[in-house]
């Protein structure tokens, strides 16, 4: 997240000049932000809930370090109990929104500034369609 530099500041404090920092970001250009966050939440529930052992899951730990500890453990518990739809519903919209670029193109453009102002040097973009990828490319390349 470009909004929580304290989460990764220690890991990059000794980076050499020119060190590249890449981050994946999902993009969904839509007028319905909540609906646009659904695929993001589905993906997050899988990673937070099911990637790794219950006692050691990088994604659960990262979400906790980002200030969503109770939610991270709830998602993991629900997912591991086979209650995947409930795990998806337990992903906070605030969290999903903070680590993605979802909404009308104007909102996506405005929120790109937070990434530009962060230590991230390159975004690895995933979009739902070629058209959305083209829209975002035009924003970035302007």
Protein language model features and the residues they cover:
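Active-site-adjacent structural elements that line small-molecule/cofactor binding pockets in enzymes
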Residues: 1-142
């Amino acid at each position: 997240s470009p909004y929580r530099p304290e989460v990764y500041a220690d890991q990059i404090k000794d980076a050499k000049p020119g060190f590249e920092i890449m981050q994946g970001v999902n993009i969904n250009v839509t007028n319905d932000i909540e609906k646009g966050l659904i695929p993001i939440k589905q993906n997050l529930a899988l990673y937070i809930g099911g990637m790794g052992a219950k006692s050691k899951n990088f994604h659960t730990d990262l979400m906790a370090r980002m200030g969503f500890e109770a939610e991270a453990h709830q998602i993991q518990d629900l997912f591991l109990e086979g209650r995947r739809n409930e795990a998806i519903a337990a992903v906070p919209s605030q969290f999903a929104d903070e680590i993605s670029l979802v909404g009308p193109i104007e909102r996506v453009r405005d929120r790109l500034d937070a990434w530009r102002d962060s230590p991230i040097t390159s975004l690895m973009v995933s979009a739902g369609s070629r058209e959305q990828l083209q829209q975002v490319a035009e924003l970035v390349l302007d």
